[in-house]
Amino acid sequence: MVMEKLGDSLQGALKKLIGAGRIDERTVNEVVKDIQRALLQADVNVKLVMGMSQRIKERAMKEEPPAGMNPREHVIRIVYQELMEIIGKGAEIQLKPQTIMMVGLQGSGKTTSAAKLARYFQRKGLKAGVVAADTFRPGAYHQLKTLAEKLNVGFYGEEGNPDAVEITKNGLKALEKYDIRIVDTAGRHALEADLIEEMERIHAVAKPDHKFMVLDAGIGQQASQQAHAFNDSVGITGVIITKLDGTAKGGGALSAVSETKAPIAFIGVGETPEDFEKFEADRFISRLLGMGDLKSLMEKAEESLSEEDVNVEALMQGRFTLKDMYKQLEAMNKMGPLKQIMSMLPMGMGGMKFSDEMFQATSDKMKNYKVIMDSMTEEEMTDPRVIGGSRIKRISKGSGCSSEDVRELLKYHKTMQTALKGFRGGKFNIQKMMKKKMGM
C-alpha cells in the first residue's frame, strides 16, 4: 500500500473520531494530536503540520456541517480537505507529443522512472522513446537500454560518449518521429556546480515541455533544499515520487512538493511498470484515509483486462465454470500484486488489513489453484460436477498437489458461484455494508 505506516496511523485517528460518543473540543484535539504525530513521524515538515493542525481545530469547532452530513463526517471531510491543501492538485498530463527532461538525485530511481514513464504513454496509445544522456553513472546506458527493450519502448544512446549535451541533441533528432521523447540526465547533488551547469545546457538544447524532478520517498527533510535548487536551475514543472510502497515515510518528499508548488505528476508504488501511477491527489488522500480508490481500481482493470479475460454477462447470469475462474485468476495477475489491489478498496468492502504473510499465502494459494486446474480435462473445467473421487486422485497426482488441495479448490469455486448468484439477486447492499462497518 502507498505509505502504509502513515495510512495506518491516519486511519487509526479517524477510527477514534468515529468511535467517539460526541464530537467536542476535547475529541477534536485528541484526533488532531494523533494526526500530528502520524505526519511528523512520516517526515512531513513541522511548520506545515502545525499550520494544518490549527486549521483543522478552528474549522471543526466553528464551521457548521453541510446539510445531510453529521459532525463526524464533517471533521473527516475537513481532514481530507486540509491534506489536499498540503499536497496540492496533481500535474496536468496531456496525451500529446512532448519532450520531457528527467532530473533528480543519484539513486532516486530516475532512470527506471524514465522507462516506466515511456511505458505509461505507450499504454495510452502514444509512441514513446528514451534518450540515455546520463554519462556520469557507470552502467546508466545499459540499464536504460535493457529497460527500454524489456518494455518495448524506443531507445537512443551513445555508449562511451561523455558529452551528454551532444547525446541529447542527437537523440532528440533520432527520435523526432516519436510522440513522447524522454531525456534521462545524470543523477546529481543539486549543489554540484558542474553537474548543474550540464543540466542547464541540456535544458537549453532539449527545450523540454516538462521538467520532472524524481524524488525518493525516503529522502526526508533534505528534499526541500534539493527541490528548491533544481527548481531555481531549470524550473520544475512536475515531481515523480518513487518508492512510495511499503513503509517509506514520504513526508519529506510531500513537503518539498508543497514548498516549491511543483505538482506531483506520477508516483512509483512498486517495482513493475504497472506500479507507476499518474498522481491524482483526491484518490491518493482517499487511500491514505482508508476510503479506497475505486476509480483507480476500475481504470487498472480496464487497462489490464480484455473482454476475453472476464465474461461479465455470463457471470451475472450465474454461469461460473472452472474455466471462468481460471481466467479470473489470470486477470488478477495482470492487474498487479494482490496487496496493491486490496489497498484500493474502502474499509468495509474488503479493504481490511492483512499481514504481508497473509497476502503471500493467498497469492501462493491462487497460483496453486492454477496448477491444479492445468491438470484437469476440458469436461472437468466446463462442468466441475463430474469430478468425483477417482478424478480427484488423478488431478492430485498430475498436479503434484494433495487431494485436500483439489477439494479445497472445488469448494472455493462453489463459494464464488454462490456469491455471484447472490450479487445477481441483489442480496448485497454495499453502501449499507460500508455504513455499518464505518459506524455511520
Swiss-Prot record:
Gene from which this protein is expressed = srp54
UniProt keyword annotations, A-Z? Cytoplasm, GTP-binding, Hydrolase, Nucleotide-binding, Ribonucleoprotein, RNA-binding, Signal recognition particle
Compartments it resides in: Cytoplasm
Q: What does this protein do?
A: Involved in targeting and insertion of nascent membrane proteins into the cytoplasmic membrane. Binds to the hydrophobic signal sequence of the ribosome-nascent chain (RNC) as it emerges from the ribosomes. The SRP-RNC complex is then targeted to the cytoplasmic membrane where it interacts with the SRP receptor FtsY.
Q: Which residues bind GTP?
A: 104-111, 184-188, 242-245
- State how it assembles: Part of the signal recognition particle protein translocation system, which is composed of SRP and FtsY. Archaeal SRP consists of a 7S RNA molecule of 300 nucleotides and two protein subunits: SRP54 and SRP19.
- Under what name is this protein listed? Signal recognition particle 54 kDa protein
Q: What is the lineage of its organism?
A: Archaea, Methanobacteriati, Methanobacteriota, Stenosarchaea group, Methanomicrobia
Question: Which segments cross the bilayer?
Answer: none
The record's top EC class is hydrolase
Record-linked CDD domains: SRP54_G
Primary location class: cytoplasm
EC number(s) on file: 3.6.5.4
Tell me any Pfam family this protein matches: SRP54
Q: Which GO terms describe its cellular component?
A: signal recognition particle
Q: Which GO terms describe its biological process?
A: SRP-dependent cotranslational protein targeting to membrane
